[in-house]
């Protein structure tokens, strides 16, 4: 394919994504869901015309990881910390932790019932289905009240972090024993210390850079640190979340030496520019990731009745567990928080991180696709329902 044709296609996808984003904001249909359908439509058209296609599955993990970093960073930059929000933060953290753990356990039991495979293997395969997608949830809740929006941002970001930690924990501990939890504790303390040092270093660096190109450098450092932390199996997404929160709330710190050496006059201006940069960059990456994921899917996979039955049981588990926790434990307004539990980018990334020999027969890309579509439609229904009641 000639280079100018490729340029036309890529720029056309960005324009279409921009228009779909505007359409999504007016209709409350998740924009990423529309992008999936664009990818499916392109694939079906090419298959119909018998045009050969490229295998794009190999670039999905890298593209998705960079997109995830930017989306979590963008979401963290929107969070203003105040002491009175401690209850909200704790509530969202506990919701993310408890719901994820129980959902993973329930899905693992379903997988074991269907496959009779070892429970440890079933847990690893179940983990992707327990993790909420901040990439899909955060852009979809822009119209909610500030408290509900912040709850979703915190919960989905915590869910991403905990899900990755849990997945790595299962992958690196074939036999779970006391030492496994000690190692996890050490890793958690290590990442918190690294996050604190890293936040101070980057804020100092931003203040000292006088060259007009600085934000690409900061994002590149974020991505590099994320990658290095992943090599050592550390929950690297914590660094991204911590830096975004720290940057947006640095001016609230009253410690005089900190204000003297780290704060600078144009911090708020740089913060606004960085937020714009991360938002536009995540928009581009989200566009290509979900279009490519839709492109790699085969719509005929959804015709498998056994897969639909199994997927239906997973859906029931997801929403029953969420309802019980939010209603009787967290005791928060269910509308529309109950419905905002989409699966998406993290789910896909974790699934493709599984070595082929560790994937169970029941967990396939078709099942993944079905759960992503179904949870997206449920979220869309919940947000549209909340909008009507608000009117």
PLM-predicted stretches and their roles:
Residues 1-391:
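Transmembrane helical cores of multi-pass secondary ion antiporters/exchangers
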């Amino acid at each position: 394919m000639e280079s100018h044709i490729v340029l036309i296609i890529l720029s056309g996808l960005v324009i279409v994504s921009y228009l779909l984003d505007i359409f999504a904001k007016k209709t409350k249909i998740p924009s990423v869901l529309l992008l999936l359908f664009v990818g499916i439509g392109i694939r079906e058209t090419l298959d119909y015309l018998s045009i050969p296609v490229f295998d794009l599955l190999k670039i999905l993990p890298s593209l998705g990881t960079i997109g995830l970093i930017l989306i979590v960073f963008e979401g963290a930059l929107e969070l203003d910390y105040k002491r009175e929000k401690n209850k909200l933060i704790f509530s969202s953290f506990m919701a993310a932790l408890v719901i994820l753990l129980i959902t993973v356990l329930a899905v693992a039991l379903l997988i074991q019932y269907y496959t009779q495979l070892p429970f440890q293997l079933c847990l690893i395969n179940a983990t992707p289905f327990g993790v909420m997608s901040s990439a899909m949830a955060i852009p979809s809740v822009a119209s909610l009240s500030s408290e509900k929006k912040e709850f979703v941002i915190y919960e989905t970001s915590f869910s991403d972090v905990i899900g990755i930690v849990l997945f790595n924990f299962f992958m690196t501990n074939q036999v779970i024993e006391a030492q496994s939890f000690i190692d996890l504790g050490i890793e958690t303390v290590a990442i918190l210390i690294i996050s604190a040092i890293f936040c101070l270093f980057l804020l100092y660096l931003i203040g000292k850079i006088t060259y007009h190109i600085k934000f690409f450098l900061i994002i590149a450092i974020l991505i590099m640190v994320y990658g290095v932390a992943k090599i050592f199996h550390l929950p690297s997404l914590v660094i991204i979340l911590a830096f975004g929160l720290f940057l947006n709330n640095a001016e609230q710190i009253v410690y005089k030496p900190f204000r003297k050496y780290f704060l600078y006059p144009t911090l708020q201006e740089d913060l606004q520019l960085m937020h714009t940069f991360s938002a536009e960059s995540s928009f581009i990456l989200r566009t290509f990731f979900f279009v490519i994921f839709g492109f790699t899917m085969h719509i005929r996979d959804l015709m498998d009745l056994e897969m639909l039955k199994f997927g239906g049981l997973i859906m029931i588990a997801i929403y029953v567990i969420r309802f019980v926790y939010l209603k009787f434990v967290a005791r928060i307004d269910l509308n529309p928080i109950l419905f905002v539990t989409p699966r998406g980018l993290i789910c896909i990334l974790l699934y493709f991180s599984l070595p082929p020999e560790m994937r169970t027969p029941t967990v396939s890309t078709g099942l993944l696709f079905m759960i992503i579509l179904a949870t997206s439609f449920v979220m869309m229904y919940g947000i549209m329902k909340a909008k009507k009641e608000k009117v």
